[in-house]
Amino acid sequence: MINHFDLKKVPPSIKEDFSEILKIINQCFSSHFKVKNNLFYELSFVSEKQSLQLNSSLRNKEYVADIISVCLWENAEIITPLLGEIFICSKKIAKDAIKYDVNFWYLLIRMIIHGLLHLLEFDHEQSDAYEYVTLTIQEQIVNKVIKTAKKKIWKNQELLSLLG
């Protein structure tokens, strides 16, 4: 089972619902890949400034990223139960949700799954074929998460609108 082991700086406005959504993401992701061992990742919310700094230092890219994954398995001699760390810029995701006219929660779920795929070394930037496979798997898991989450009762009205 894939589990987050540490959450840092979750914005208070989404904290309660976010914990539930994250459990569903972990369950659906683990189920999709038939993960039997305990694997872990760290998830941290960062500011736009921190996202820019991380993207610059880790990826040599000069823009605010919605999500940055740091895979500990990449080129590793030893595989550990710790997959890596995911940095989320919720302000960037909120801006993108408005820009692309999609729900914030949908985009947040999609980006976390995208980040988890990167931790498993799925790299959509490698080729068109890798991009197709990665994004297909991503959408399959997103759909499972939404379907599972629809069965839950949420207090957050925005989240209720996402789940229909």
UniProtKB/Swiss-Prot annotation:
Zn(2+) binds at residues 114, 118, 124. Pfam families: YbeY (PF02130). Transmembrane segments: none annotated. It comes from the Bacteria. GO terms for cellular component: cytoplasm. One of its GO terms (biological process) is rRNA processing. Its main location: cytoplasm. GO terms for molecular function: metalloendopeptidase activity; RNA endonuclease activity; zinc ion binding. Binds 1 zinc ion. Its cofactor is Zn(2+). Its EC number is 3.1.-.-. Keywords: Cytoplasm, Endonuclease, Hydrolase, Metal-binding, Nuclease, Ribosome biogenesis, rRNA processing, Zinc. It is found in: Cytoplasm. InterPro entries: MetalPrtase_cat_dom_sf_prd, YbeY. Single strand-specific metallo-endoribonuclease involved in late-stage 70S ribosome quality control and in maturation of the 3' terminus of the 16S rRNA. Belongs to the endoribonuclease YbeY family. HAMAP family: Endoribonucl_YbeY (MF_00009). This is Endoribonuclease YbeY. It comes from Mycoplasmoides gallisepticum (strain R(low / passage 15 / clone 2)) (Mycoplasma gallisepticum). The gene is ybeY.
